[in-house]
UniProtKB/Swiss-Prot annotation:
UniProt name for this protein: Putative uncharacterized protein DDB_G0275003
Lineage: Eukaryota, Amoebozoa, Evosea, Eumycetozoa, Dictyostelia
Species of the source: Dictyostelium discoideum (Social amoeba)
Domain of life: Eukaryota
Length: 626
């Protein structure tokens, strides 16, 4: 049986392009660029294209018709050749870009002098009309621009400063006579301590901003990728002023920290003055981020956000998407430290029983800058000095309870935020609060608390038939008893009416039943991802008591690392099997479990196979992996 061409086309499109996300907003990581820094470029799956395109003439033509995006760097073969798989008539989007020719830091240093003379690429950017002569069906033109600013230049220059001169004099003239949309993506790299004040107010940049605003939305800075930001920089205001003048719609920031093999590496504090490794890492407050005009998307990489930054987020009506991390353990650590329970019935009493944590807090030399706003001794999450240098804590620690509450309230009343991704910054490798509370939890799992009391039936452990698995209690399950953290977070979820996609990652155990129950009241979330954010018991509660009462969530993703009892035939826990059989509102369900225990205690009973379970469900697409 021969498939029709439209089906072959869809199959090939999936096989070739789906894996590589070959779209206009895709950003790959070029490890050869600028000492492992990030670079904006397209990933063209050439090997896949040739593997399928050279099978026969028919497949050649189908694959060729699927290639609608190309760039100056993708192919060097003649565009007019009928034997070229990239046919100019099929191209609707073109990426005009230049890539640096060096690969190492030494090569970068050797080329610095040439940057002061002429554009070292030897090629200028082409205008719309020039590209239309080659690609007559062009609909969108993307310019990848490099703005790199070094601290050791006597005269600061852009690598691509000529782009702005050409843009102002030539490019905008073409936009009025064509239907081609222009998107500009900028990589802005600033070496620490570089002075960019004069650049941020440069006439060419200001004229560029004015031209953008007057282009009737035919031209926009679609994305700005900032690399090199550091809290020790004295020119952060100038950097954000420059970003404001460039008017980006999306902003991605990578903090300037060295991370090798998943661990923070030692760096000297410029104020330590001891010549050794006595300094500590620092993070930026990002307070200026929300002040950027017309920003629609914010993403922070390799750093965390302080809660006070997002207080007032409801006033930023342009912002649609936020992807950030929080230092939840630091926030909870200071909530515990600042709050003094009145009696043992207080919900924080569980934390007070954790002797290791209390001892750590009492023995630590807490010192504050500006009287109360900065905890600068050592990080609760990276405090093993023999292994790693500590990282600075959150800012405004004395206000962390109030800041968290106000931030959650601001998000809850936002009417324009559509996409929210929140993840835990701590990797738990050297986390003292994790070790302390986990130690307390393990004692509970043996039936004994730190004060010697027998907890008996109060132990929150997993059980299945006659088998009891007591060491699966998660350390964070102690922390989720803190109402200062969980109550505002619950209200944020239940009261918000605009968020359609919510992604929670790395919050394992922090989501108690109160937080999970807030999804019952929420009526806006359509796509929910709970990755590494549920314990075994919370998974059962969520699937049994929450999801049956929510009708708006259509796409659900769950990734679980806890030990999990699974039926040997269905390969999933009973609560999930029942949910799959009874749910009538979900469209897609994706579950991934890393640590499963197969239960075969009911061999005599009638078994439901995985295949029959999936076939009997009304959920359109189900993907379960263990």
């Amino acid at each position: 049986m021969i498939l029709p061409n439209y089906l072959i086309s869809k199959i090939l499109n999936y096989l070739i392009f789906h894996e590589y996300q070959y779209e206009i907003n895709y950003i790959s990581l070029d490890k050869n660029y600028f000492d492992n820094n990030y670079y904006i470029c397209e990933h063209f799956p050439a090997s896949h294209i040739l593997s399928y395109g050279l099978v026969c003439k028919e497949l050649f033509e189908i694959v060729s018709s699927l290639i609608t995006i190309t760039s100056r760097l993708s192919f060097k073969c003649p565009r007019h050749s009928k034997f070229c798989i990239v046919q100019s008539k099929n191209i609707t989007r073109f990426i005009e870009e230049h890539r640096p020719s060096y690969k190492t830091k030494s090569e970068r240093d050797s080329i610095k002098s040439s940057l002061l003379k002429e554009n070292n690429y030897g090629e200028r950017y082409r205008t719309i009309q020039e590209l239309l002569d080659i690609y007559p069906n062009l609909k969108e033109l993307v310019y990848n621009i490099n703005l790199l600013i070094f601290s050791d230049f006597n005269e600061l220059r852009f690598w691509d400063e000529k782009f702005f001169e050409q843009f102002n004099s030539e490019f905008l003239k073409s936009t009025t006579s064509s239907n081609v949309k222009i998107k500009i993506r900028i990589l802005l790299y600033c070496e620490p301590n570089s002075n960019i004040k004069t650049i941020s107010t440069k006439k060419s940049i200001l004229k560029f901003k004015n031209d953008i605003e007057n282009s009737n939305k035919k031209v926009q800075v679609d994305l700005l990728y900032l690399k090199g930001l550091d809290s020790n920089m004295e020119n952060q205001d100038d950097i954000f002023q420059l970003i404001n003048n460039l008017t980006p719609k999306k902003l991605i920031i990578v903090n300037e920290k060295k991370i090798l093999n998943g661990e923070l590496q030692e760096i000297q504090d410029k104020n330590s003055g001891d010549g050794g490794g006595g300094g500590f890492f620092s993070h930026s407050s990002y307070l200026k981020v929300l002040q950027i005009n017309n920003i629609k998307k914010i993403k922070i990489i390799k750093d965390f956000m302080d809660p006070f930054v997002f207080i007032g987020i409801e006033n930023n009506i342009q912002l649609k998407s936020v992807d950030i991390g929080f230092h939840f353990h630091e926030i909870l650590f200071h909530m515990i430290r600042l709050f003094k329970p009145v009696n043992k019935n207080n919900s924080s009493h569980l934390i007070e029983n954790c002797k290791n944590l209390k001892k750590y807090i009492s023995n630590s030399d807490f010192s504050f800058l500006d009287k109360d706003d900065f905890y600068c001794f050592k990080s609760i999450c990276n405090a093993d000095e023999e292994v790693i240098q500590p990282i600075q804590s959150i800012f405004r620690v004395s206000h962390c309870i109030k800041d968290w509450e106000e931030m959650c309230h601001s998000i809850s009343i936002s009417t324009t935020l559509k996409d929210l991704k929140i993840k835990e910054f701590c990797n738990k490798l050297h986390c003292q609060i994790w070790k302390s509370i986990s130690s307390y939890s393990n004692k509970k799992s043996d039936g004994i608390t730190d004060d010697g009391d027998d907890v008996g039936d109060r132990v929150d452990c997993c059980s299945h038939d006659k088998i009891h698995y007591r060491d699966c209690i998660n350390g964070n399950e102690v922390m989720n008893k803190i109402p200062f953290f969980t109550d505002p977070f619950s209200l944020m979820i239940s009261n918000n009416k605009s968020i359609e996609t919510l992604h929670l990652e790395g919050m394992n155990g922090l989501l108690n039943e109160t937080v999970l129950s807030s999804f019952i009241k929420n009526k806006s979330i359509k796509k929910l991802s709970l990755n590494y954010s549920l314990s075994h018991s919370n998974l059962d509660y969520f699937l049994t008591n929450v999801m049956p009462r929510n009708t708006t969530i259509k796409h659900l993703e769950i990734v679980l690392t806890d030990k999990l009892w699974c039926d040997k035939n269905t390969c999933c826990p009973n609560s999930l099997a029942n949910f799959i059989q009874t749910n009538t509102t979900l469209s897609t369900l994706k579950c991934q479990f890393f640590d499963t225990i197969i239960d075969d205690s009911n061999d005599g009973a009638k078994k439901l196979t995985f295949e029959s379970l999936i076939n009997s469900s009304k959920i359109q697409k189900i993907n379960i992996s263990t």
